[in-house]
Amino acid sequence: MTRLFLSFILIFAAGFAGAQTFPTKTVTVIIGVAPGGTLDTLARQIAAGLSPILKQPVVVENVTGAAGLVGFQRLMKSEPDGHTLNFSNMSLLIIPHMHPKGGFDPLRDLAPVAGVATVPMVMAVSNKSGIKDLPSLIAHMRRNPGKVNLGNGGPGTTAHLSQALFLNIVKADAQLIQYRGTGPVLADVMSGVIDGIIDQTVTLMPLHTSKRAHAIAVSTPRRIAQMPDVPTFAEGGVPEFDLRIWNGFLAPKGTPRPVLERLAAAISQVIDSPEYKERVEK
């Protein structure tokens, strides 16, 4: 019994010592989407704040493919020592159902590190679409089934699922155009190649405030301070579309708890800082 107790003490001490010296090299944050979208933007903003706290470079690597599965496969092959992380959102729960042979089980393979934000969704339309508000968009889709084009960053993404949910609620039909990442979608919304998009506020707020696109609804109970001129979905006649997306950091299963706690504390320090809050609100 004494020997067993001493073994537990040694294991705990080794983990604590590892956390005290962690990190010893560059920390890589994998995201499973192309540059330009919400995940990419948030990950890079947080990575910039983490580097001085952890006193090591924190880099973001875009590892795309199979709705994020390829990025998680890379994470699962990495050492569970905290130097490789993944930044994702609730769409990770869809991956095993889209790719059942991919060998990925979030409950089995991942260790949660820190939640970062719960973000509402925004419907925005191209300035060239002629659409002024949510009721007129819905009426247009019902009069012209399949004629409206909505873009998203790929199958299984939160944007894709949000658009499918919206169409189901309003009983209308539109073409859901799937891109490889959100960046190209935004470019096509601004140029008028497609009519609109539903995505997170972090992605669409800059387009609306700069008048490069027109936000017509936000999925919050009340209007948000950053876009006070944008009505809620409920104001537009669709109260059922009440949706917010969570984003967070994950590590490979088996990462020592003291290391996870060190990372969580550092991430919390970043997202609570005035500098980070100012960047996100812009």
Question: What residue ranges belong to the model's regions?
Answer:
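Bacterial N-terminal signal peptides that target proteins for export
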Residues: 1-8
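Short secondary-structure boundary segments
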Residues: 89-90, 127, 200-202, 220-221, ...
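Short beta-strand->loop
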Residues: 105-115, 173-177, 195-196, 205-243
